[in-house]
């Protein structure tokens, strides 16, 4: 700098900046910290995490997406890893822990290459070459099947390790039944809209009391005690308008000078409700499910006619009811005809736990169904709900794709072996990155073994030996403390879950590697008395975020 030259201040006072290798190192450490936080939850023998929020509410789970969503993460790079988990969960419903653990390991391997002087861009290019080759290998080794036995295995794999205990077989059957019920074929392609599977939960009973309903469960009771508890051969009217006297849009007053006219006025109101109920009765409906309110007088006349009615049904439930029963939602009672009514074998009010619910059951060819989860505590039913939602998603995408892969780390072991060989055919320093990618994949079988208390080194050696012999379905056998044939054990993973996890991990790893400058603005209202680093986050002089 020339003598007397005044330094130019570009950033505001208090802004902290990290550049070059320091920025890269801190970003990598943050990503590794997040990966390590969920790594012990991977696989059927993975451990659970207890999460306590600021008001003392407790969540016990080993679901990666749930854990990361509930964690209070501040580091910007750590937040990027959490976003990977969210993206994986949104796209395919499972494999969140795998994606995060792979992200952390890819960055760990990249750190070694950075120490050797390999440029981040070269590492990123090598990783992209590796993931493209991995996609080809996965397509080659994928198995084809959409039969119920395969779908059941997919469900069991998704449920394993969750807090569903001895109920996995039972729950897997419910999941397959639900997915098959809502599956449709459009233009020769199988489509499964999992939004048409309603998952409800109620405390009480055991997990084995969980029910599949060929129809929809509504968390509402009938509006009048005199209405029937059970309606057989139900003809269902779905009404999106209030069975009430409409209020005028302008303020109006009615002045009655003759006291005898008061009764006439009340009679007119009563007649209006009678006409409403008469229209419903004339259509042939014996069940009314209304999205809006039902007046007390209308309730009385509906009960008098033996018509079962529920009010203020959620819009989402109304849409599912239409798909399940074949009914059309009407907004005007004049449009209520026999042709717009839905059908169900039974509509029944049942007491579930402390609540009364309406069951619309026995729908013919329903395109929307329900699963009602039972369990002893809030923690149990919530974890079963998370497990079922994951299982439903992965079974649905397997049904759509018609392909699956062998689980237990078998795919990662096969990819690691083939990519190591592929690296030899690639010139330049990208070869080193592809080799690092192959080595990073071994974190999955290694972690599965570690979490089960099995020697990871011996397991990896045996696994490599089996795959060198061409046995692509051999993975980590957690039951026999070694390696085994996943085909014989029925351990399978959906193809889309694996490919998406790989792609997401590579995307975030390459993005983080290319960051060489972190500029953090000063907090406007920093918490008093805090200094140093946030607990659990890596240090190395990283500014607080």
UniProtKB/Swiss-Prot annotation:
Q: Does the record's keyword annotation contain Chaperone?
A: yes
How would you describe the post-translational modification of this protein?
The N-terminus is blocked.
**Which keywords does this Swiss-Prot/TrEMBL entry list?**
ATP-binding, Chaperone, Nucleotide-binding
- Show the segment(s) annotated as Disordered: 522-545
Identify the Pfam families for this entry: Cpn60_TCP1
Domain of life according to the entry: Archaea
What one GO molecular function would you report for this record? unfolded protein binding
Tell me which family the UniProt entry assigns to this protein: Belongs to the TCP-1 chaperonin family.
UniProt-listed Gene3D superfamilies? GroEL, GroEL-like equatorial domain, TCP-1-like chaperonin intermediate domain
Tell whether Chaperone is among the UniProt keywords.
yes
Where are stretches of biased composition, namely Gly residues? 529-545
User: TM spans, by residue?
Assistant: none
Report the protein's function: Molecular chaperone; binds unfolded polypeptides in vitro, and has a weak ATPase activity.
User: What is the designated name of this protein?
Assistant: Thermosome subunit alpha
Q: Which organism is it from?
A: Thermoplasma acidophilum (strain ATCC 25905 / DSM 1728 / JCM 9062 / NBRC 15155 / AMRC-C165)
